[in-house]
C-alpha cells in the first residue's frame, strides 16, 4: 500500500546521480514473501546481470527506470514476431548504468497458469529470432562455463526454431557450440517440441 511513497523516498538517494538507471526491488506473493530470494545483503549499486549471474539472486523484480534512459533502449522485436525478453533491454542498460538495490517487496502478484513464465518454450517457438538473439547475447556475456553452456544451448535451440542456418559459426564460442549441440537438439525435441 505504500509502494509509491517508498519509491519516492528511495529515489531521493540517487537523484542527480547519472550512474543509476533506476531502482530494482522485489515482487512477492504477499508483503512478506518474495517470489524467489531476497536481495543479497549489503548491496547498493548493482546491475541486473550481476544480481542474477554473480550474486545468485533468483526470482522476480520490480523495476523502476528513468524514462529518458528507457527511451534510448527500444525493444528490438524481430519482423513478424510480437515479443522479446524484457531482460534483453535491461541487460543493455546494465552496460552503462547501475540500479539501486532495494530489498523491499513493491509488487504483489501471482503466476498465471498460462503466463509467460509457465509457457516460456511456446513463447520462444512463436518468437524464435528474438529468442536466439537474446540467448546469443547472454552466452557472450556469461562469465562461468555453466552459464555459457546453458545460454549457448538455448541459443542453438532458438536457431533451430527459427531455421537459422550457420548457428555454430554465429555462436560466441564455436567450440562450446559444437559441444552443446547434442544437448540443444534434445531440448529442441523435448522441452521445445
Report the location of each language-model feature:
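Conserved donor NDP-sugar-binding/catalytic core segment of glycosyltransferases
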Residues: 2-37
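Alpha-solenoid repeat scaffolds
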Residues: 14-17, 145, 166
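Alpha-helical elements of Rossmann-like donor-binding domains used by nucleotide-donor carbohydrate transfer enzymes
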Residues: 2, 6-9, 88, 92, ...
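Structural motif
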Residues: 142-149, 174-180
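Structural register within alpha-helical repeat arrays
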Residues: 148-158
